[in-house]
């Protein structure tokens, strides 16, 4: 299943240069009820490896990282930024609840920084009132506010 962005199928040849995106997933049950899930997904995954002694760049090279060792600045680590599995991504839930099937994947917006990504995800989760909506599968906001812990919210499952 492909991602939809602004009503059209989103499948670029190259991964975009954005940091990540905010998404909405729609699930359906056998009775035709729709359930939503909101989240964020990074497009890049940074890893650090020891730099090659030859000075060559590895695949997915982003930049070299220097350290001050015994008063000398030595290029000793390389930061790699391979693309994440965002094309096949199906949400950060551990598993899809029984009886539900994924019916729609939508990109709501792209973000340039990690701070933007966290802010806009949190903003959307509060705006959509996810902790009180029984047709929403999000069970917490930012790891701080949990369904079932706030008066009047849905029960935590």
Locations of regions flagged by a protein language model:
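Feature targets compositionally biased, intrinsically disordered low-complexity regions
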Residues: 6, 19, 31, 38, ...
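Boundary/linker segments flanking structured domains
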Residues: 1-17, 103, 108-157
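GIY-YIG nuclease catalytic motif and its immediate N-terminal context
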Residues: 1-51, 152-157
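Poly-acidic low-complexity segments
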Residues: 36, 47, 64, 136-138
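Conserved short loop/helix modules at catalytic or binding sites
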Residues: 41-114
């Amino acid at each position: 299943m492909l991602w939809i962005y602004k009503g059209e199928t989103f499948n670029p040849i190259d991964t975009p240069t954005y940091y990540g995106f905010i998404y909405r997933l729609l699930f359906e049950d056998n009775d035709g009820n729709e359930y939503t899930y909101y989240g964020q997904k990074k497009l890049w995954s940074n890893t650090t490896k020891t730099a090659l002694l030859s000075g060559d760049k590895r695949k997915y090279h982003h930049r070299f990282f220097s350290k001050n060792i015994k008063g000398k600045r030595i290029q000793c680590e390389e930061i790699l930024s391979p693309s994440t599995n965002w094309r096949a991504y199906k949400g950060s839930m551990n598993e899809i609840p029984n009886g539900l099937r994924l019916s729609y994947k939508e990109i709501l917006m792209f973000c340039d920084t990690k701070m933007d990504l966290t802010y806009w995800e949190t903003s959307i989760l509060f705006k959509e009132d996810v902790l009180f909506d029984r047709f929403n599968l999000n069970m917490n906001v930012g790891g701080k506010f949990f369904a079932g812990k706030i008066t009047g919210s849905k029960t935590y499952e």
